[in-house]
Amino acid sequence: MKHRIGRVEGEILRELTKILRKDIRDPRLNDVTITAVECTNDLSYATVYYSMLTDDPAKEKEVAEGLDKAKGMMRHLLGQTLTVYKVPELIFKRDTSVAYGSKIDKLINQVKKQDQERENKNK
């Protein structure tokens, strides 16, 4: 059963990415990337994780509203392509791992820069 769930999650991820790029015309969703999908064991719910290019809270709220508005259309279009009896209910959650990774990368670069400055002063 786990193999089937993983296959359906991959199929939903692939199809939602296509739908978001080709069929949804909401300008609020231009910078959104679907990063992962997790389905419940009975495939009744699918948690869709997304990331954005910005960390602006106002933009984040706009994107959440845009995804909520487009949820019905996305589910309908998914139903036309998925090979499951019932299309899962979509739940959108922000994937903060990309932003967290970017923040860690900036901190590492700052430390490297400070180390270089200290080395140059000691010479």
From Swiss-Prot:
> Which ranges of the sequence are coiled-coil?
none
Q: Which family does it belong to?
A: Belongs to the RbfA family.
Q: Which GO molecular function entries does the Swiss-Prot or TrEMBL record give?
A: ribosomal small subunit binding
Natural source organism: Lactobacillus johnsonii (strain CNCM I-12250 / La1 / NCC 533)
Annotated Gene3D superfamilies: 3.30.300.20
List the InterPro entries.
KH_dom-like_a/b, RbfA, RbfA_dom_sf, Ribosome-bd_factorA_CS
Q: Which GO terms describe its biological process?
A: maturation of SSU-rRNA
According to its UniProt entry, what is the function of this protein?
One of several proteins that assist in the late maturation steps of the functional core of the 30S ribosomal subunit. Associates with free 30S ribosomal subunits (but not with 30S subunits that are part of 70S ribosomes or polysomes). Required for efficient processing of 16S rRNA. May interact with the 5'-terminal helix region of 16S rRNA.
Subcellular location, record wording? Cytoplasm
* UniProt protein name: Ribosome-binding factor A
GO CC terms: cytosol
Q: Partners and quaternary state?
A: Monomer. Binds 30S ribosomal subunits, but not 50S ribosomal subunits or 70S ribosomes.
Keyword annotations from UniProtKB, A to Z: Cytoplasm, Ribosome biogenesis
